[in-house]
Amino acid sequence: GQSMADTFNMLRANDLIWSFFVNNYLLGKEPKPFDLLFWNSDQTRMPKALHMFYLRKFYGENALSKGELVMDNVKLDLSTVKTPVYVQSSKEDHIAPARSVYRGAKLFGGPVTFTLSGSGHIAGVINAPVARKYQHWTNADMPDTVEAWMTGTTETPGSWWPHWLNWLSEKSGGQVPARDPAKGPLKPLEDAPGSYVKVKS
C-alpha cells in the first residue's frame, strides 16, 4: 500500500511530498487536520504480486483497453459489456486524466454516461452536495474525444452526486427496506463499521 501511495505522490511531488517537507520539517509547522488527506493516507494493502500485475498489465501494457487482459483464462473485452455504465472523471486528476478515462469509457459496448467533475483525483470524487463546491459537466453525446465532448457540455455548479443519483434511480427498481444481517443465514462477524477499518496499513 505504501509503495503504491508513494508512486502516486511522486506524480505531484511538489504538492504531495515537498510541501510537507518544507512546511512540517524545515519550518516546523503542524499540519492542519484535513479529512480527505487523513483518509488518503490509509492505503489499501496489496500483495506484491498483485501490485506488479496491476502496474505491468494496466499501466505498462495497457492490456485491458487493447482487449488483451486475461483473468482466470478468460480474455476481458469491454466491448461485450452491454449494460449501462456511468463513468465519472475529474478535470484536474493527475492519476487518471480525464482524456484517458474518456477513452476507456468509449471501449464499452453499451450506453455510457460520462460526467466530468471539477477538482482532482480525490476531491473531485468525494464532493458531497452539502459542500456546494466545484462543478460538473454533462453531455448525453459521446463524440470521439473528450475535447469534442466538452464543446457540447452543460456546466452545473456543485457536486456530480445528484446527477449520478438520478441516473441510478432511472435504472433501479423501487426502494426496499434495508436487510437485517442478523436475520440472514450467516452470523454477523461484528458491528459496523468493522474492525478492519481501524487497521492502519
Q: Which sequence ranges carry the predicted segments?
A:
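Catalytic active-site module of serine/aspartate enzymes centered on a nucleophile-bearing elbow/loop
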Residues: 113-201
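Acidic catalytic loop of the alpha/beta-hydrolase fold
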Residues: 92-96, 121-123
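Short beta-strand/loop motif that positions the catalytic acidic residue
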Residues: 81, 87-89, 93
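Alpha/beta-hydrolase-fold enzymes
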Residues: 1-52, 57, 63, 169-201
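The feature captures the conserved acid-bearing segment of alpha/beta-hydrolase catalytic domains
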Residues: 71-82
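Short acidic (Asp/Glu) and glycine-rich catalytic loops that position anionic groups and cofactors
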Residues: 29-37, 81-83, 140-145
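Hydrophobic, well-ordered secondary-structure elements that form the walls
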Residues: 55, 104, 164
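Short alpha-helix in the alpha/beta-hydrolase fold that links the catalytic acid
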Residues: 97-107, 118
